[in-house]
Amino acid sequence: MKVKKGEIYLADLSDASGSEQGKVRPVLIIQNNRGNKYSPTTIVACLSSKIYAKHHLPTHCILPDGLGLKYRSMVMCEQIRVIDKSRLFKKIATLNKRQMAIIDKKIKISLDLRLHNPKK
């Protein structure tokens, strides 16, 4: 299956444990396209439609309406996992570059990645 960074798919995550996100749900592909091209797995961030029931974290990104999702949803950039591409079964939408730039910032917050600018 060919997938690209920024695409949203339905995925079967039914083997979740504890506080992991499970069941069939939308996920956002966050792995780079080189990895997506050559690997049988991909890296995803889970989406949730419970945007008002959850505590808002700096790693959450509410998605705009009109993407084809059944409910208004948010990307939970703290809920990242590697999945086999066979778990993906329906493409729903593709985020634009501006939206993905926001997601990338939220992932950096989640993983505590800081840009390092060495002095010249």
Regions found by a protein language model. Give the residues of each.
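Conserved functional hotspots at enzyme active or ligand-binding sites that engage polyanionic ligands
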Residues: M1-K120
